[in-house]
Structure formats: structure tokens, C-alpha cells
A protein has these predicted regions:
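Small-residue-enriched hydrophobic alpha-helices in membranes
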Residues: 1-139
């Protein structure tokens, strides 16, 4: 249906989170909560409304339904983000994966795809992953 050709940077960040959340058996309540909380609190989303979040999420889901949706989404994310926001995108994706304690193997696989598509330094990616794990530890 959609043949998305571009996203604005905030939409690309949302799309990155949705990719990870949708990787498993569906988007969990904890993943929705994390995505919503991040959009409300992370400075890169300043001025990004709940309505825009809903629209961007729907666009990302539709994109994933395309025949080559995952690869297309990866390219769109990469092409829509300035280099300075690529680590931010990966950090947001890790936060979503951490919402389920990195237990969903499909989400972890998508993180690998995102990391590769964004050409992140492996040490930087590992530090971002470890930071997300540390924030989501439970007693």
C-alpha cells in the first residue's frame, strides 16, 4: 500500500522503535509504555505530539507490511537520520528491547539489523546496549 520514500527524523526514530517492538509476537504493553514515555521525555521529541506518535507508529506498521518492508524500513531510517542521530536511534531501539529485558530473540535480531544499517561502531553499540540493560535491571 505505502511506498514511503522519506521520513522526517522524528518519524525515523519512531520507526526504529516500532521495528524492535513489532519483531516478536506483537507489540507488548511494556513496549508501548516505553515508546510513549520516551516520546514524552527525550529532548529529540520536543514538540512531537501524541497524535504524531500514533500516525508515525501506524506508518511504520504499514511499512513493515510491505513485501520488502523490513529492508525498506532500514533504508528509510538510515536515509532519514542525520549521522548525529543514528546513535540516538539505536539507544531508543535498545530501550524498547530492554522493556522486555532483551528476552525476545526477534527483537535482538532486529537490533543487529538496525546497528548494521546505521553503521554504528561496535563498541558504541555495545555501550548503548549495556546502558539500556543496566537501566532495566530489577531487584
Amino acid at each position: 500500500m505505502l511506498a514511503e520514500t522519506s521520513l522526517d527524523p522524528q518519524e525515523a526514530l519512531v520507526c526504529t522503535m516500532v521495528l524492535v517492538a513489532a519483531a516478536g509476537e506483537g507489540i507488548t504493553d511494556s513496549e508501548i509504555g516505553v515508546m510513549s514515555g520516551l516520546v514524552q521525555t527525550v529532548p529529540v521529541f520536543r514538540g512531537f505530539s501524541a497524535d504524531r506518535l500514533a500516525v508515525a507508529t501506524d506508518r511504520a506498521v504499514e511499512l513493515l507490511r510491505e513485501a520488502d518492508g523490513l529492508a525498506h524500513a532500514g533504508r528509510l531510517i538510515r536515509d532519514s537520520l542525520p549521522p548525529r542521530l543514528r546513535e540516538t536511534a539505536y539507544a531508543l531501539a535498545c530501550e524498547v528491547a530492554a522493556a522486555d529485558f532483551f528476552e525476545d530473540r526477534a527483537s535482538v535480531s532486529i537490533l543487529e539489523l538496525v546497528r548494521d544499517e546505521l553503521a554504528l561502531d561496535p563498541l558504541v553499540a555495545a555501550a548503548i546496549e549495556r546502558g539500556a540493560r543496566a537501566r532495566y535491571q530489577v531487584v
